Regions:
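Non-catalytic, solvent-exposed segments at the cell envelope interface
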Residues: 1-213
Length: 213
């Protein structure tokens, strides 16, 4: 699981200039965002899932809440999160994942908590076997998620890859903050981008002949 910092400076495919990677979606929706991330990581991306984080509580509640491990005590948006293992439901996961300013790691700490939330949903969702549970989840997904996966493909992933949740690796994109013309960017060295791309290709069992389209 890889989180790309939103301020990462890279080429916006289809625009022909460099900008923050999260601007690709604003310029051209999921298609331009996918093209830009594909170019940045040099790997093919066949599917996407766009999540409405403001309504993510519906998905968390549909799986019966989630469990996370919190690194330090903090309060945010009226909620208090103590250090240690926490059970979250309702609007708690969104508040937990959004806090940034009190975290000594800043946006990287927020990215880690966002990955925890996603991992928690995967853990709970993959363990469901009854039709009722699955119907609740699909109902929540239908309201809050946009994807190019078909229903059968979603069912197939839940059925065939649920054990993969026990073997999830998390990677951070290494770089440093910089200012160009007064605007803050996250600059990723070419050697780091190449190393990350190679790692992903190895895990995905793809080679350069596939990525060179």
């Amino acid at each position: 699981m890889v989180s790309i910092p939103r301020d990462t400076r890279t080429e916006i495919v289809g625009k022909g200039f460099q900008d923050k990677i999260n601007h690709a979606y604003a310029f051209g929706g999921p298609e331009m965002a996918i093209d830009t991330v594909e170019n940045f990581l040099d790997i093919p991306i066949d599917y996407y899932v766009q999540v409405n984080m403001e309504s993510f509580k519906d998905i968390v509640d549909a799986v019966g809440g989630i469990t996370v491990n919190n690194d330090f005590d903090f309060s945010f948006e009226g909620y208090t999160f103590n250090k240690g293992q926490l059970s979250l439901d309702g609007k708690e996961p969104l508040a937990y994942s959004r806090m940034r300013k009190e975290d000594p790691r800043g946006d990287f700490g927020r990215q880690d908590r966002q990955r925890q939330i996603i991992q928690g949903v995967i853990e709970k969702g993959a363990s469901f076997t009854t039709l009722t549970n699955f119907s609740d989840i699909m109902g929540a997904i239908g309201k809050n998620i946009q994807t190019n996966l078909t229903f059968d493909e979603i069912v197939g992933i839940q059925k065939n890859y649920k054990d993969a949740r026990h073997n999830v690796e998390q990677s951070m994109v290494k770089g440093q903050g910089t200012r160009i013309d007064g605007i803050y960017y996250y600059s990723v060295p070419e050697e780091e981008r190449t190393a990350l791309s190679s790692m992903l290709k190895e895990h995905l069992k793809i080679n350069d002949s596939i990525t060179k389209r």
